[in-house]
Amino acid sequence: MSQNNPLRALLDKQDILLLDGAMATELEARGCNLADSLWSAKVLVENPELIREVHLDYYRAGAQCAITASYQATPAGFAARGLDEAQSKALIGKSVELARKAREAYLAENPQAGTLLVAGSVGPYGAYLADGSEYRGDYHCSVEAFQAFHRPRVEALLDAGADLLACETLPNFSEIEALAELLTAYPRARAWFSFTLRDSEHLSDGTPLRDVVALLAGYPQVVALGINCIALENTTAALQHLHGLTVLPLVVYPNSGEHYDAVSKTWHHHGEHCAQLADYLPQWQAAGARLIGGCCRTTPADIAALKARS
């Protein structure tokens, strides 16, 4: 398995691998209205060039891995727009193509940059539900149903040339198990799995992280694991817990230091000082994090700050 692991060569040479940050935040800054169940996947349909620009900005900021704009891109989601599975898979493949084109553009500017990766985003079934389920994990499907949901996107991402998969924002143990088993049908595929949490020791659905790690230890295609899309202040304790459970590289890409007001549906600074991702870098590294980036509300400036501190 190790010879097909795209992370290994990079992590053998450097302490951390920088991921990118939020896609949606940057698209909104460019005038996109993402008030839609498809979220940033909507832009794959309407204005894909903007996605390439965002990827390029993150590479320029220091990211070594772009995560595709396919988190909410599924045939089930696109069906509401009247697209069939073939059309949906073509759009999912487009998300990889856009990231690859951004990589090509950055390498043309910086031929000495070295290896850059493209990770295909595989968001959870809860993201398709578009009701916050990815932060609760309180949904239930059979293994077959979960795999039927994920299979077309996994195939499209791999066929389009993603270097690995980012199976991310996963809140549900049964879905994690189904997705890990699905990967065995694609033996050359490699993935990281990252989770949303109820607390530092439990998945959002309440499953102990110890049980999740034990499950994934049986799937060598999973080459890193960790956490994403959680509050910045909750990251270190969770990483410390995971570090005691696995020898795999740990992944962390939390939300910005802002806090979300569910009533007004707006983000706000908390107190006089809003913590930044880079403030946490030393403690994340001490807790075993090797793949580090940002999720909601983070920007190329956040990745540049991580780069400056690393």
UniProtKB/Swiss-Prot annotation:
Lineage: superkingdom: Bacteria
Function: Catalyzes methyl transfer from S-methylmethionine or S-adenosylmethionine (less efficient) to homocysteine, selenohomocysteine and less efficiently selenocysteine.
Description of how the protein assembles with itself and partners: Monomer.
Pfam families referenced in this protein's UniProt entry, alphabetically: S-methyl_trans (PF02574)
Cofactor annotation: Zn(2+)
Gene: mmuM
Organism: Escherichia coli (strain K12)
Residues annotated as domain Hcy-binding: 1-310
Entry protein name: Homocysteine S-methyltransferase
Keyword line: Amino-acid biosynthesis, Metal-binding, Methionine biosynthesis, Methyltransferase, S-adenosyl-L-methionine, Transferase, Zinc
GO biological process: DNA damage response; methionine biosynthetic process; methylation; S-methylmethionine cycle; S-methylmethionine metabolic process
Chemical reaction(s) catalysed: S-methyl-L-methionine + L-homocysteine = 2 L-methionine + H(+)
GO MF annotations, alphabetized: S-adenosylmethionine-homocysteine S-methyltransferase activity; S-methylmethionine-homocysteine S-methyltransferase activity; zinc ion binding
Class of this enzyme: transferase
Disulfide bonds: none
EC number: 2.1.1.10
Annotated residues for binding of Zn(2+): 229, 295-296
